[in-house]
Curated annotation (Swiss-Prot):
Metabolic or biological pathway: Cofactor biosynthesis; (R)-pantothenate biosynthesis; (R)-pantothenate from (R)-pantoate and beta-alanine: step 1/1
GO biological process: pantothenate biosynthetic process
Annotated (R)-pantoate binding sites: Q62, Q154
Pfam assignment, any one: Pantoate_ligase
Protein name: Pantothenate synthetase
Catalytic activity as recorded in UniProt: (R)-pantoate + beta-alanine + ATP = (R)-pantothenate + AMP + diphosphate + H(+)
Subunit structure comment from the entry: Homodimer.
Keywords (A to Z) from UniProt: ATP-binding, Cytoplasm, Ligase, Nucleotide-binding, Pantothenate biosynthesis
Taxonomic lineage of the native organism: Bacteria, Pseudomonadati, Pseudomonadota, Alphaproteobacteria, Rhodobacterales
PANTHER family the record matches: CYTIDYLATE KINASE/PANTOATE-BETA-ALANINE LIGASE, PANTOATE--BETA-ALANINE LIGASE
Highest taxon of source: Bacteria
């Protein structure tokens, strides 16, 4: 089993030894409740770096709903066993007081790319993400960091963060891992009922149909409206957004020109699912 480090001091001592030996360090930031998507990131890190750290920290600052924070699954023993199978070198699993000690007063806010979509529906969420990610990069001194494309907006926020603050880490975006029926892997999926799980792939199917329609010349507003209607017809309770945006800055796209991204968030069984695909 990989060692589970609880303090910044332990982590820094370990990383200092690796750096002194000239080894490269990769980090995979997670909130635990690991699944095959996380493991694919760890494998990618394992292939690219001499040493791999996976962080497990349920970050209270990125939850704007306390009930969501409470419900978030915590499965550290299972997570460590899964990571052992991948061969990671260390797990960093600090408590909240280690990351945010008494008197902590700094907030990192990335404007622009963090504001629409998830930012509009979850105020403060990306400030919490940016703050903890900036801290993790400082703590781990990572050369590379691995993030899933499933959280596309988060990936864009992190890329902007490291560019603007000159943080010397390379951000690697890794393809979304999906179930056989197309559902994007997510720690939240385990909260779906059996019936909800069967309905959940309707989200990505509607998105794929919209992308195909737009490529075929369908007007963008019509294609998006049809996709939203299809998601609701499949049994989802709400659609927070289903929008076409530029891939990098997440600006609204009026026509297909350059790289676009179709991003969606919808609620099923009271569980908020997000997804995105290239267009």
């Amino acid at each position: 089993m990989p060692p589970v480090l609880r303090t910044v001091a332990e982590l820094r001592a370990r990383v200092s030894d690796w750096k002194a030996a000239g080894e490269t360090v990769g980090v995979v930031p997670t909130m635990g409740a690991l699944h095959e998507g996380h493991l694919s990131l760890a494998r990618r890190a394992r292939a690219a770096c001499d040493r791999v750290i996976v962080t497990i920290f349920v970050n209270p600052r990125q939850f704007n709903n306390p009930a969501d924070l409470e419900k978030y699954p915590r499965t550290e023993a299972q997570d460590a066993a899964l990571l052992a199978s991948v061969g990671v070198d260390a797990v960093f699993a600090p408590g909240p007081e280690e990351v945010y000690p008494r008197g902590f007063a700094t907030n990192v806010s990335v404007s622009g790319v963090s504001e629409p979509l998830e930012g509009a529906h979850r105020p403060g969420h990306f400030d919490g993400v940016a703050t903890v990610v900036a801290k993790l990069f400082g703590m781990t001194r990572a050369d590379r960091a691995f993030f899933g494309e499933k959280d596309w907006q988060q990936l864009m926020v992190v890329q902007r963060l490291v560019a603007d603050l000159n943080i010397p880490v390379t951000i690697e975006g890794c393809a979304t891992v999906r179930e056989a029926d197309g559902l994007a892997l997510s720690s939240r999926n385990r909260r779906l009922s059996v019936e909800g799980r069967a309905r959940a792939p309707a989200l990505v199917r509607a998105m794929q149909a919209a992308a195909e329609a737009m490529r075929g010349g369908r007007a963008i507003p019509e294609a998006l409206a049809e996709a939203r209607a299809a998601v609701l017809a499949a049994g989802f309770e709400t659609v927070d957004y289903l929008e076409l945006r530029t891939a990098d800055l997440l600006l609204p796209m009026e026509r297909l020109q350059g790289e676009g991204r179709l991003l969606a968030a919808a609620t099923l069984d009271g569980v908020r699912l997000i997804d995105n695909i290239p267009v």
